[in-house]
Curated annotation (Swiss-Prot):
GO BP field: defense response to bacterium; defense response to fungus; innate immune response; killing of cells of another organism
Taxon lineage: Eukaryota, Metazoa, Chordata, Craniata, Vertebrata
Identification of the protein by name: Temporin-ALk
Residue ranges annotated as propeptide in the record: 23-46
A Pfam family this chain is assigned to: FSAP_sig_propep
Primary site of residence: secreted
Stored InterPro entries: Frog_antimicrobial_propeptide
Function: Antimicrobial peptide with weak activity against Gram-positive and Gram-negative bacteria and against fungi. Has been tested against S.aureus (MIC=15.0 ug/mL), B.pumilus (no activity detected), B.cereus (no activity detected), E.coli (MIC=30.0 ug/mL), B.dysenteriae (MIC=60.0 ug/mL), A.cacoaceticus (MIC=75.0 ug/mL), P.aeruginosa (MIC=25.0 ug/mL) and C.albicans (MIC=15.0 ug/mL). Also shows a weak hemolytic activity.
GO (cellular component) term, any one: extracellular region
Subcellular location(s) per record: Secreted
Signal peptide: 1-22
Family: Belongs to the frog skin active peptide (FSAP) family. Temporin subfamily.
UniProt keyword list: Amidation, Amphibian defense peptide, Antibiotic, Antimicrobial, Cleavage on pair of basic residues, Fungicide, Immunity, Innate immunity, Secreted, Signal
Length: 57
């Protein structure tokens, strides 16, 4: 019975560590996506006024 408890405890801790690592990776991926979206918005803000001036002038 003692070895079963140790095995279950070990599996629990390994699973917890695995979930923690997955969560960190997911958060990092979301941050990368957010950064990409912000960069695209900055490019659009810089690009559209230039195109507008070229088309009107």
């Amino acid at each position: 019975m003692f070895t079963l408890k140790k095995s279950l405890l070990l599996l629990f801790f390994l699973g917890t560590i695995n979930l923690s690592l997955c969560e960190q990776e997911r958060n990092a991926e979301e941050e990368r996506r957010d950064d990409l979206g912000e960069r695209q918005a900055e490019v659009e803000k810089r690009f559209f006024p230039i195109v507008g001036k070229l088309l009107s002038g």
